UniProtKB/Swiss-Prot annotation:
Subcellular location, record wording: Cell inner membrane
Gene name as annotated: rhaT
Keyword Cell membrane: yes
Organism: Shigella dysenteriae serotype 1 (strain Sd197)
Protein's recorded name: L-rhamnose-proton symporter
UniProt record similarity statement: Belongs to the L-rhamnose transporter (TC 2.A.7.6) family.
Keyword presence, Transmembrane helix: yes
């Protein structure tokens, strides 16, 4: 396995670790509605950081974006909005299926759809079937899916042992939402694929290869921001128990505390795709669709590890932890299989 591929896998791991940890600061926010907290974090992660970093990278910010036709920018934006819809459905999936089953089904579907639909859209799916390296990477995707399934099973065993149940368990409604969440969340993968002309334009301006994907986030995350922030603002305006004014009428130190923690959560959310861009830049072009598989499977891996570190599994018993460990090992094996396949 080449050093470039190894580093690509490593940066995807770092990005996924940030994704697995990003919600920790949000849990420390006090006396704010979820909608206010999520909006503040989202403004940082989907608007401020993409714009600020792009302004630093590009020699002429406005000239860069105005150089693209609507036919180039619109798919990128709409796929970003598609991801935003999936993101909203994510919480509802947890509500009706419970954390473990909801995450397992949603992540499993978005892993498959986001990984395999990209080469199909690009018309090079035959690379997966007709070449040794392609077949090896396809095997890695399958093994990763098995790993996600094992980790999901571990979560179910943990919830059963600890008496944790879904807020309003409804299998039919939950499955529909999980499938929708999985498909729509893959919009981020499609958006990045559609943004390739933006990568090329950034490279032509002298932007370092590690950073060429970052300017596209202004458009991608802009689409997602409209959906997420729109959802939050509508709820803040219509739901009687929610009030932005009340949330910002608390004691000043508490407001500052909440803003800083929400901003930190937003920063950590953004960093997952900052390092995704670094990892993606190291992956061979013919296997660039594998970036999504690496990110999603490592997200599940890191989520399990973070749960162990935070002692969330302490009262779960030995069997769930053993199953979780097995799932993590399978995901690591999958990453190595994919790496070997790309090297071939």
């Amino acid at each position: 396995m080449s050093n470039a591929i190894t580093m690509g896998i490593f940066w995807h791991l770092i990005g996924a670790a940030s994704a697995a940890c990003f919600y920790a600061p949000f849990k420390k926010v006090k006396k704010w509605s979820w909608e206010t907290m999520w909006s503040v974090g989202g403004i940082v992660s989907w608007i401020i950081l993409p714009w600020a970093i792009s302004a630093l990278l590009l020699p002429n910010f406005w000239a860069y974006y105005s150089s693209f036709s609507l036919s180039t920018l619109l798919p990128v934006f709409l796929f970003g909005a598609m991801w935003g819809i999936g993101n909203i459905n994510y919480g509802l999936t947890m509500r009706y299926l419970g954390m473990s089953m909801g995450i397992g089904i949603a992540i499993g579907i978005t892993l498959i759809v986001g990984t395999l639909m990209t080469p199909i859209i690009n018309g090079n799916f035959d690379v997966l079937i007709s070449t040794e390296g392609g077949r090896m990477t396809l095997l890695g995707v399958l093994v990763a899916l098995i790993g996600v399934g094992i980790v999901t099973r571990a979560g179910q065993l943990k919830e059963r042992k600890m008496g944790i149940k879904a807020e309003e368990f409804n299998l039919k409604k939950g499955l529909v939402l999980a499938v929708m969440c999985g498909i729509f969340s893959a919009g981020m993968s499609f958006a990045m694929n559609a943004a390739k002309p933006m990568y090329e334009a950034a490279a032509a301006l002298g932007v370092d290869p590690l950073y060429v994907a970052l300017p596209s986030y202004v458009v991608i995350m802009g689409g997602g921001a409209i959906i997420n922030l729109g959802f939050c603002f509508i709820r803040l305006a219509k739901v009687k128990d929610l009030s932005l004014k009340v949330d910002f009428s608390l004691e000043k130190p508490l407001i500052i505390h909440n803003v800083l923690l929400s901003a930190l959560g937003g920063l950590m959310w953004y960093l997952q795709f900052f390092f995704y861009a670094w990892g993606h830049a190291r992956i061979p072009a013919q296997y660039d669709y594998i970036s999504w598989m690496l990110h999603m499977s490592f997200y599940v891996l890191c989520g399990g590890i973070v749960g162990l570190v935070l002692k969330e599994w302490n009262n779960a018993g030995r069997r769930p932890v053993t199953v979780l460990s097995l799932g993590c090992v399978v995901i690591i094996v999958a990453a190595n299989i994919v790496g070997i396949g790309m090297a071939n």
